Amino acid sequence: SPGERVVTIETAAELRLQHGHVVRLETRPPSIEGTGELGVRDLMINSLRMRPDRIIVGEVRGAEALDLLQAMNAGRDGSMGTIHANSPADALARLEVMALSAGMGLSSRPVREQIAAAIDLVIHIVRLRDGSRRVVHVSEVTGMEGDTIMVSDLFDWYQTHVDSEGFAQGVFRPTGIVPRAIHRIEDIGIYQPP
């Protein structure tokens, strides 16, 4: 909504959000003397003092993953970040490893529980051989089963052919799984056709 405060955290400011209340934070390298560095984790912690409604981290690469998960589990719905991974499940596994690197002495189980509670959707984008980028999976995190974070693909992209100019063509199709969060989706005005 227009009144929401969105805080973006990036190594190099690239996001150009069309929103009225955006606070843009950018990392800073250390000075020649080796002081004054502001990393993503520093900015993540400082952003929480700004009373954000949503936090967007340009790229989650390390211990800031734990801070982002905690923020997401404390009412900052719609927060997001990017992670380089080979699949939605791999992205969640990488997020776990990064959160564990925060040095808080946590074991895997509570971190996985935080991930399962915080993350609703994983959007997987790949770069194809032709250089184009495609969303190939929209997956929902459905909770935990034992020690495993459960993920269900809601949509996937299937390559049908390569056109005469060498570009991959395909179809983005629903898998038939109705999202568990369908009521929350409808509450914000997005309806699934019957």
Regions found by a protein language model. Give the residues of each.
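Conserved inter-motif catalytic segment of the P-loop NTP-binding fold
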Residues: E26-E33, Q114
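A generic structural signal for short
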Residues: I32, I56-V57, G170
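Short glycine-rich substrate-engagement loop in P-loop NTPases that contacts/grips substrate
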Residues: E33-R41
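NTP-binding/hydrolysis catalytic cores, primarily Walker-type P-loop NTPases
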Residues: G131-P194
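Histidine/acidic residue-rich metal-binding segments in metalloenzymes
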Residues: M44
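Conserved P-loop NTPase nucleotide-binding/switch module
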Residues: I9-V23, S47-G146
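Conserved, well-ordered active-site substructure
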Residues: S1, R24-L25
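Post-Walker A helix-loop "phosphate-sensing" segment adjacent to the P-loop in P-loop NTPases
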Residues: S1-V7
